[in-house]
């Protein structure tokens, strides 16, 4: 009998029963809730006169709609200017109180983006199944979890039953071998992967990221890569449990205590792919050949490295790709063949569930070296992913490095990743962003998003245009 993949082991450990149609009933260990996708789910519970099946499995925090400007944030929910956004946060507060679900409220020191808060609090542990009404739930797969986003109706199902009906995906392994060069980060790795396989490359698969690059990568770096598995077409991205995983989890507030630790660790260490496991698809990439990446268009697969130029139509692999590029040239206000380093920028955003952890902020701060944000930059903001990240950064003096350089130091939240709160781009503005999506209008109507690493974003802020952080 062939060995099992990491995905197989996680699936089998949580499969309650197989169904006649080929689907399975899967038990869910951890359910993360926020203000946008939960109101109708709670309403459904109430109308059916149901209560959450397992209260302790649920944790909530507002993140999408919260203001990041300190003055507005100090007013709490009342500081949210948009009526709909304010109502969503108030509704989350009310529902959590009504159903007795634990919540890190807007100005709780533990509040933040759920995909940052979950791991840092130890709420997400190796071997778990984790769901949230948000597509970037794949982030948690970095801890050796089966984690994916769900819709609002499924949020209600999990609240009511702690289970979901799912169909098993195929297994894909993406191996990145060798060592990364100086100035190349986990964000560059995942952008390079998406550039290679496309945004549909992982469709129908659960992706396991493996190889020397991932073995050497920090836990926060792994989270960045798994976060963008969805941009590669997969609902699920994961990395096997190893010493890095165990060391990260130990001592977290919700992690097992000392008396339970040995047993928990022994169980967690079973979550890896067996040597003889068979994958439906295997892709290999030489990590030593990856350079800092920049997205130029309106899809995460429209990516080149910093030394290259916007591709020309004759480079397209088919007519559909050429049509997409032609539309992207127009929307982005770029010319085919234009050097990436010639793209002038208006705003800089360092944050999001992809790149707002302490290592990300350290990477960005290290680039500043006493320099100032370019006069041509209208706004450069740094938004920590959680209250705990913000406090740690301030304890290390990173906030002062940013503000002295001309960045704004904001309060935790999803911020400019998506145009759902007050942090938005104006039409035709170019933004170097550490977020995960560059679709048309993602950061504001007519806004032009370029996906980069925190270090590349910081360097771009200082130069006013994209530069190669390796030589900056």
Curated annotation (Swiss-Prot):
Q: Signal peptide location in the record?
A: none
According to UniProt, the reaction catalysed is:
(2R,3S)-3-isopropylmalate = (2S)-2-isopropylmalate
- The broad enzyme category this protein falls into is lyase
- Disulfide connectivity for this sequence is none
Gene Ontology BP term (one): L-leucine biosynthetic process
Q: In which pathway does it act?
A: Amino-acid biosynthesis; L-leucine biosynthesis; L-leucine from 3-methyl-2-oxobutanoate: step 2/4
Bound cofactor: record note: Binds 1 [4Fe-4S] cluster per subunit.
Q: For binding [4Fe-4S] cluster, which residues are annotated in this chain's numbering?
A: 353, 414, 417
Q: Keyword set for this entry?
A: 4Fe-4S, Amino-acid biosynthesis, Branched-chain amino acid biosynthesis, Iron, Iron-sulfur, Leucine biosynthesis, Lyase, Metal-binding
Q: State one molecular function term (GO).
A: 4 iron, 4 sulfur cluster binding
**Enzyme Commission code:** 4.2.1.33
Cofactor(s) required for function per UniProt: [4Fe-4S] cluster
Q: Which InterPro entries match?
A: 3-IsopropMal_deHydase_lsu, Acnase/IPM_dHydase_lsu_aba_1/3, Acoase/IPM_deHydtase_lsu_aba, Aconitase_4Fe-4S_BS, Aconitase_4Fe-4S_dom, IPM_dehydratase_rel_enz, IPMI_cat
Q: Which family does it belong to?
A: Belongs to the aconitase/IPM isomerase family. LeuC type 1 subfamily.
Self-association and partners: Heterodimer of LeuC and LeuD.
Q: Which PANTHER family match?
A: 3-ISOPROPYLMALATE DEHYDRATASE, HOMOACONITASE, MITOCHONDRIAL-RELATED
Q: Which HAMAP family match?
A: LeuC_type1 (MF_01026)
Which NCBIfam families did the record assign? Answer: leuC (TIGR00170), PRK05478.1 (NF004016), PRK12466.1 (NF009116)
What role does this protein play? Catalyzes the isomerization between 2-isopropylmalate and 3-isopropylmalate, via the formation of 2-isopropylmaleate.
Put simply, this protein is called 3-isopropylmalate dehydratase large subunit
**Organism lineage:** Bacteria, Pseudomonadati, Pseudomonadota, Gammaproteobacteria, Moraxellales
